[in-house]
Regions:
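ATP phosphate-binding glycine-rich loop
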Residues: 8
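Short acidic-hydrophobic catalytic motif
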Residues: 1-4, 12-15
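Non-catalytic connector elements of ABC transporters
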Residues: 18-20, 27-140
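N-terminal sensory regulatory modules of PAS/LOV and PAS-like folds
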Residues: 11, 25
Length: 140
């Protein structure tokens, strides 16, 4: 129910450390393109909710739905940023990434011992990415 599909930005704020990205929706294909920062390509979200062209919206994305990598991913929902802070909790790492517009987006990953690549650290340039269905579109 509510946990997977929160229906208001107010509610989403209280559900874990959800990322909220503010933007403007434009109908596109199977969902909406969301303009969210100057000179950045739009993000895309699939939803069954109806939004009008040019309507303000919020994208809510849980940190564990966001992938973080040093190489540019092959997906349309990708944002370049810099690691600002890292929080370790048990077997989870939460990366606080500064993205265009001086915003912070949190990405959470499970720590695995078989990480052959160098661990991410502060000030690293990274890419955040997620699937078209990972973000929930909310009205203002």
């Amino acid at each position: 129910g509510t946990y997977e599909q929160p229906n208001s930005a107010y509610l989403a704020d209280f559900i874990r450390e959800v990322n909220i990205i503010n933007g403007v929706a434009t109908p596109q294909g199977d969902g909406y393109d969301i303009a969210w920062a100057e000179s950045q390509p739009p993000l895309h979200a699939q939803t069954t909710r109806g939004f009008s062209d040019g309507q303000s919206c919020h994208l809510a994305i849980r940190p564990e739905k966001i992938s973080i990598s040093t190489e540019e991913p092959e997906t349309r929902n990708k944002v370049r940023g810099t690691v600002h802070d890292i929080a370790y909790l048990g077997n989870l790492s939460t990366y606080h990434v500064r993205v265009p517009g001086e915003r912070i987006i949190k990405a959470q990953t499970a720590n695995t011992r078989r990480l052959s690549r160098r661990a991410l650290t502060w000030e690293d340039d990274v890419w955040l990415s997620w699937t078209d269905t990972a973000a929930v579109m909310l009205e203002e």
